[in-house]
Regions:
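A short acidic, Gly/Pro-enriched loop at the edge of an enzyme's catalytic core
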Residues: 130-138
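Conserved class I S-adenosyl-L-methionine
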Residues: 5-67, 73-82, 175-176
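A short SAM/SAH-binding and catalytic strip from SAM-dependent methyltransferases
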Residues: 137-148
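A short glycine-rich, Lys/Arg-flanked "PGG" loop and its adjoining helix->strand segment in the class I
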Residues: 152-163
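Class I SAM-dependent methyltransferase SAM/SAH-binding core
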Residues: 83-127
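Core SAM-dependent methyltransferase catalytic element
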Residues: 198-216
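Conserved beta-strand signature within the Rossmann-like core of class I S-adenosyl-L-methionine
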Residues: 164-172
Length: 216
């Protein structure tokens, strides 16, 4: 069961701490993503299989809903797409183009099994990847807390947005630095919509935000 109310002090429970521990294992002390081998090992051990569970449905539904209702038929870039959980939740006619990137080659290999004529999955580090095309929606789904300089990364990707394009962000409230990242994003970009979700069973909460460049 999920609600749109959030009580951070009660929701930083076991699930949130466990998720943070996974993220921390993918970091170096300077905050930069660790080698791809770390993420490969986690995917091989099934550490991220929970992203396909019912408890994640509400969060993914918000992101998919933003895409379907705010930019129907648009081109979508999904950074840190993992095994393609977001694309699986998108109707095939809801986008004209979908590109998913992830540091883990094994995750991308799984995602490619659902690839269609309008979608592409690439093994790439989102901190270094340079899009070769422009998009109507760029998604940062539980990614920004893993990056050394999340705001600069978002700024770089925004240059690949079409006019009127959107940035979609999902952050687990238990993830270290998430509140600061969200505050800085709200200062730099216009908030189109924001939803706070809490899952009572897993004791975890998220914030899903739709943003656009100022002045558009």
């Amino acid at each position: 069961m999920s609600t749109q109310s959030e009580r951070p002090n009660k929701l930083l429970g076991h699930a949130g701490r466990w998720l943070q521990s996974l993220v921390d294992r993918g970091r170096r002390s300077d905050g930069l993503l660790q080698s791809a081998q770390t993420w490969e090992a986690q995917y091989a051990a099934g550490k991220w299989d929970f992203l396909a569970e019912l408890s994640e449905l509400s969060r993914f539904s918000i992101l998919a809903g933003y895409i379907c209702h705010l930019k129907p038929g648009g081109a979508v870039l999904d950074t840190g797409c993992g095994q393609g959980a977001l694309q699986r939740r998108l109707p095939s006619d809801s986008y004209s183009r979908y590109v998913g990137i992830d540091l883990s080659a094994s995750a991308i290999s799984v995602a490619r099994k659902q690839q269609n004529e309008r979608s592409t999955f690439l093994a790439a580090d989102c901190e270094n990847y340079s899009p070769e095309e422009r998009f109507d929606v760029i998604v940062f789904n539980e990614v920004l807390c893993c990056l050394r300089d999340p705001l600069r990364t978002v700024e770089r990707y925004v240059r690949s947005l079409n006019s009127g394009g959107l940035v979609l962000v999902s952050l687990c409230s238990a993830a270290r630095g998430s509140a600061t990242i969200l505050w800085r994003l709200r200062q730099a970009y216009a908030t189109v919509d924001e939803v706070r979700l809490a899952h009572s069973g897993r004791k975890v909460a998220w914030v899903c935000t739709a943003l656009r460049p100022q002045g558009e």
